[in-house]
Amino acid sequence: MGFAFDGDADRCLAIDSDGNEVDGDKLIAVISAEMKRNNTLKNDTAVITVMSNIGFWKFCDKNGIKAVKTAVGDRYVLEEMLKSGYNIGGEQSGHIIFLDYATTGDGQLTAVQTLCTMKKRGESLKKLAEIMTCYPQTLVNIRVTPEGKAALSSDEAVKAAIAEAEEKLCS
């Protein structure tokens, strides 16, 4: 197994013993589940972004963890964590904030937290990562004007269609 960091080491992804990627969503799942077991997960909640895999929501439902969704960007994750008193949050990209230790993403801290969880549980990362199933996910960017974005964001029919699709996928 191993860890990979971006250029300034604020992001961390892991590779399990079979060479499978363990992304930020799975790392947050593994670590937040351990925090919940140890009664250190504040309000039993993890903060994630709209980019998170639907598998994270299913993991939360199955494990009694609440997920709060923010816009993409660590600043939005941190803002929600500070506002509501949560202590773990992050992005699929591996940008994870552990508010008990820092107010920014720290890839090395993510690696240490992952290793500590492995040691406490006595299990490999491969085994721990099985706690969450990643579902196929596609990102499609659609260009819209700022006015169009505002109109779509506030359109009740669009909101209802999104909620209906999320409900179907999460059940």
Set out the residue ranges of the language-model regions.
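Anionic group-transfer/hydrolysis microenvironments
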Residues: 6-8, 18, 51, 93
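N-terminal small/polar loop signature for handling phosphorylated ligands or for N-terminal nucleophile
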Residues: 1-15
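Glycine-rich tight-turn/loop motif centered on a GG-T
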Residues: 17-22, 148-151
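Short beta-strand-to-turn element immediately C-terminal to the catalytic PLP-Schiff-base lysine
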Residues: 13-17, 97-99
